[in-house]
Structures are given as structure tokens and as C-alpha cells.
């Protein structure tokens, strides 16, 4: 069969061909491999036994991470190296793990989701990132890998022992990352005012947008914060805070999550406080209850509160 094109329609066909080719090129660039390109679901181990299997599960099945650069980084930064007990059972399961000092390392799907949300704000070079409540150092290491050799990452943590352990974990992973990573002992709520940041990651829940204002002030124009927001014993909202090139702030809530609270060192080390997770965890063969209680639903006026805060912070 021979297809004869109407001369009047040739420009249209040519334009459509260019658009189709552009779509395929873009799809190929965004795809990590043939499974993404053709939108084929890859079979994944639901009980991952390695970092690679874990990231495949998050990427192909749970679809918590889509950006290919984030996928590559998550495969490079081995979660097991950052756990308190290197012999912990099921280190690659998608669940939070205790790391001591009443702190936890978040579930892998939360790391994946939050880093994915930051992906398009990571500069090609000379970027600066801030990791608040760096804890195990896992996300700090991921940010160090993502920012590249010209970038800089600041991790703020108020438990010195966790910082020491983070440094040792990164040394085992890739000691050259420490050339661009700096850990500081301090109160993460205040950030670190000596720098302005392209991206800010909060690994614990900040009480309110008002409390987060100091962090928003430290964001560069064109930058982004991803953070859980809410009171310590509530569910939290995962929020994305963007500052455009003119310095105008916009905020979006992406839904309900549950994190440990961003709190003082004294409160965190108080033996009456428990990690803010809601599940039974198997630790060294012994099942341990890590808090289980009825929690109020998030504020139904959330969108109104966000709009009010946007108006306040953008007021000239």
C-alpha cells in the first residue's frame, strides 16, 4: 500500500512527526531502561535482599521514585551501611528502623519520594543542599552524591554520636563524598544561616509553617524545601515549599505522612519518649512495639492555612 500525502497537509504531517520524535527522545531520556520506556512492569522481589532489589521495588512496583538520577543515587547509597546494627534482620525491607537515641531511619519509600520531589531543583554544578535532622546520614550521603563534586551539603544533627556514626558510614560507602559534606551539631529548626540553599530536606516533622519560616528564609530563589509538617503526636502533611526566581513563595500539601518530630535534644533523649512510628518491628529476633495509638486526622483547614501563610510571607 502506498500512502499519498495531500500537499496542503504535508506541513502538518511533518510537524506531527517532529512532535512524535521529540516525545520519544524525551521519554528515552527520562527512562532508566527499557521497562520505563515501554511502560512495562518489571517483576520485583516484595522482600528485597539487596539495595538494588529495594530500589527496583520502589521504582517499578511502588512507583515512589521516577527520576533516573535519583534511582541511580539510591542504588549507589547502600542503606545497610547506615543502620545502627549492621546485622539487623531484613535491612532492605521498606520500613523504618531504629538507629538509637530515640531516632529512626525513615522507610526507604519516604527517602525515595522526598528525593524525587527535589530532583528537578538540583543544580548542575555549585549547588548547596541542607539536610535537617540528618540522623543516620543516609540522606546526607544521597545529597552528596546528587550534588556532584562541585556541590556542598550541610547536615545538621543535635546528637554528636549520630554524626560520628554518619561519618563512619559514609567512609565505608565512598570517603570522597566527605569532601563535599559537612556535619554540624546544632538545632535543625534554625537551619544554618551562613548559607543559602538550593534544596532543603527535613527528615523529621516541623511543628508548623510558622516555625519553618527561618528555613524558608534560607532558601535561594528558585529553591525548594520538602518537609513533613505537624504537631509531634499527630499525623503530618508532606509539604513542598517553592521559592521562585522573584522570591515569591508557594506551598503545596501532598498528603498525610508520619515522622518523628523535630524536637530538642533533651526531649529526644527523654526515656519516656518513643520513636514516632506505628508498627511492630522485629529487632534482633525480638518483636518490639514502637508506639501504637489513635491519632487525630490532619487539620481539615490545611489549604486555608497554607494560603494565609503564603500571603503573610509574600507580603512586601
Swiss-Prot record:
Annotated EC: 2.1.1.77
Assigned GO CC terms: cytoplasm; cytosol
**UniProt binding sites for S-adenosyl-L-homocysteine:** 103-106, 111, 136, 157-158, 187-188, 263, 268
Give a Pfam family name: PCMT
Identify the catalytic residues.
106
Its top-level enzyme class, in one word, is transferase
Q: Which UniProt keywords apply?
A: Cytoplasm, Methyltransferase, S-adenosyl-L-methionine, Transferase
Cellular compartment(s):
Cytoplasm, Cytosol
Q: Which GO terms describe its biological process?
A: methylation; protein modification process
Any one GO MF annotation of this record:
protein-L-isoaspartate (D-aspartate) O-methyltransferase activity
Q: Which Gene3D superfamilies match?
A: Vaccinia Virus protein VP39
Q: Which reaction does it catalyse?
A: [protein]-L-isoaspartate + S-adenosyl-L-methionine = [protein]-L-isoaspartate alpha-methyl ester + S-adenosyl-L-homocysteine
Q: Does the keyword Nucleotide-binding apply?
A: no
Superkingdom of origin? Eukaryota
- Into which family does the record put it? Belongs to the methyltransferase superfamily. L-isoaspartyl/D-aspartyl protein methyltransferase family.
State what this protein does: Initiates the repair of damaged proteins by catalyzing methyl esterification of L-isoaspartyl and D-aspartyl residues produced by spontaneous isomerization and racemization of L-aspartyl and L-asparaginyl residues in aging peptides and proteins.
Protein name, entry field: Probable protein-L-isoaspartate O-methyltransferase
Q: Which organism is it from?
A: Dictyostelium discoideum (Social amoeba)
- Gene expressing this chain: pcmA
